[in-house]
Design a protein with these regions (language model features):
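PLP-dependent aminotransferase-like
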Residues: 1-70, 74-79, 86
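Short, hinge-like loop/turn segments at secondary-structure boundaries
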Residues: 39-41, 67, 91-95, 117
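A generic hydrophobic-helix recognition signal that picks specific residues
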Residues: 46, 70-72, 90, 114, ...
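Active-site region of PLP-dependent enzymes
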Residues: 82-88, 95-197
């Protein structure tokens, strides 16, 4: 299940992985997913909920987490527009199994292109490391949770274990992002001033 209002990059990765999208209406006061409509949209085939914390507004995570727990659903978050937002003292983007953040132009941090995914699931993290790099084993740690690496650097340099993409960040993007992190609090403060104006 996905919210009906977002950017295409919220939806395309789900579709590219072969999952069926089902759109859920929004709450007009928050522009986030309507919690009542969310629960009504759940079927026996529903596997996950992709939330978008739109324009600095965190979702109603207490209610949505209960729904996900009751129905055995995975919660994912697109937090591209809400870096620094919090719900009950916890940062938006850290409630779901994965939280995604964009570093494209006009977002809180800009590295020209790219983004950040966060998770506390180590196995999933290892899958993401491989997928971002063509499905290679090269960038996996020696104690990988998804693949037993051989003690042969040549072999691992050319071993692909799954379909993947070429979405590794460039060093210049990382350097830009590190410098902007130092200014993140002031960026957020200015965005909040702009929202009130």
């Amino acid at each position: 299940l996905v919210t009906a209002v977002s950017w295409s990059t919220t939806y395309f990765p789900i579709s590219q992985m072969g999952f069926k999208l089902r759109f859920v209406d929004i709450n007009l006061d928050t522009l986030n997913i309507d919690v009542e409509a969310l629960e009504l949209a759940i079927t026996q085939n529903t596997k996950a909920v992709m939330l978008v914390n739109l324009l600095g507004n965190p979702n109603e995570f207490d209610k949505i987490q209960k729904i996900c727990d009751d129905y055995g659903l995975i919660m994912l978050e697109d937090n591209c527009e809400s870096m620094g937002a919090a719900f009950n003292q916890k940062c938006a983007g850290t409630f779901g199994l994965i939280g995604s953040f964009s570093t494209y132009f006009s977002h809180h941090l800009c590295t020209m292109e790219g983004g950040i995914n966060v998770t506390d699931d180590e196995e999933l993290y290892h899958y993401m490391l491989s997928i971002r790099s063509h499905g290679w084993t090269r960038h996996l740690p020696d104690d990988s949770k998804i693949y037993k690496k051989l003690d042969d650097p040549f072999y691992e340099s050319f071993n692909f274990i799954m379909p993947g993409y070429n979405i590794r960040p460039l060093e210049i993007e990382a350097a830009t992002g590190i410098e902007q992190l130092k200014k993140l609090n002031s960026f957020i403060k200015q965005r909040r001033k702009n929202a009130i104006a």
